[in-house]
From Swiss-Prot:
Homodimer. This is LexA repressor. The gene is lexA. InterPro entries: LexA, LexA-like, LexA/Signal_pep-like_sf, LexA_DNA-bd_dom, LexA_repressor, Peptidase_S24_LexA, Peptidase_S24_S26A/B/C, WH-like_DNA-bd_sf. GO terms for biological process: DNA repair; DNA replication; negative regulation of DNA-templated transcription; proteolysis; SOS response. Its EC number is 3.4.21.88. One of its GO terms (molecular function) is serine-type endopeptidase activity. The active site is at residues 134, 171. Keywords: Autocatalytic cleavage, DNA damage, DNA repair, DNA replication, DNA-binding, Hydrolase, Repressor, SOS response, Transcription, Transcription regulation. The lineage of its organism: Bacteria, Pseudomonadati, Pseudomonadota, Betaproteobacteria, Burkholderiales. The keyword DNA-binding applies. It comes from Paraburkholderia phymatum (strain DSM 17167 / CIP 108236 / LMG 21445 / STM815) (Burkholderia phymatum).
Length: 216
């Protein structure tokens, strides 16, 4: 691997840990906050230095468009942008979900996208159109397409899709002794507490990637 400065190594390791833990690389703001930089611009300077050394790739216009390219054999699966020449994976796009019906019910599927499999940290089952800004600070915005893998279990800190009664929501999972907390990544939105054993809660899946419609 190319020799990095101590600070560059910290940034590289932070990106790697974030991908291993959540399936997403961090945003510039998250790197700055974690490593004590004065601003996201400082994080951007370090990212550009890493890109010049050939250990990461940066995708223009994507807040989490960071791809590790050094030490390929031991890197975690990671987010990349789609490559137009490799469009293999067919994914249904889920729009609005009707109360009480399965998330992949035919009436919820508005269209199908062909995607590059390397876009995702692991193989997704569907795309969910994000509505609202509750996950803004995680780089997930209204209208984005969240790639979701169906799961019955999720790890602490992962971004999940959950059903709460008649609603479907995207939040970050935090386990507590008495239940679950669904964390909003936007101070304008309240977190949601779910009592242990609540029949109102059902895990629909975990986020394994993100697509901006403009990327197609």
């Amino acid at each position: 691997m190319t020799k990095l400065t101590a600070r560059q190594q910290q940034v590289f390791d932070l990106i790697r840990r974030a991908i291993e833990r959540t399936g997403f690389p961090p945003t510039r703001a998250e790197i700055a906050a974690e490593l004590g930089f004065s601003s996201a611009n400082s994080a951007e300077e370090h990212l550009r230095a890493l890109a010049r050394k050939g250990v990461i790739e940066l995708a223009a216009g994507a807040s989490r468009g960071i791809r590790l390219i050094a030490g390929q054999d031991d890197l975690p699966h990671q987010f990349t942008l789609p490559h137009a020449s490799i469009m293999q994976l067919s994914l249904p796009l889920v729009g609005r979900v009707a109360a009480g019906s399965p998330i992949l019910a035919q009436e919820h599927i508005s269209q199908t996208y062909m995607c590059d499999p390397s876009l995702f940290s692991s193989k997704p089952d569907y795309l969910l159109k994000v509505r609202g800004l509750s996950m803004r600070d995680a780089g997930i915005f209204d209208g984005d397409l969240l790639a979701v893998q169906k799961k019955s279990e999720a790890k602490d800190g992962q971004i999940i899709v959950a059903r709460l009664g008649d609603d479907v929501t995207v939040k970050r999972l935090k386990r507590r002794p008495d239940g679950l907390e669904l964390i909003a990544e936007n101070p304008d939105y309240e977190n949601i507490f779910v009592q242990a054993g609540s029949a109102e809660f059902a895990l629909e899946g975990i986020a394994v990637g993100l697509i901006r419609p403009s990327e197609f």
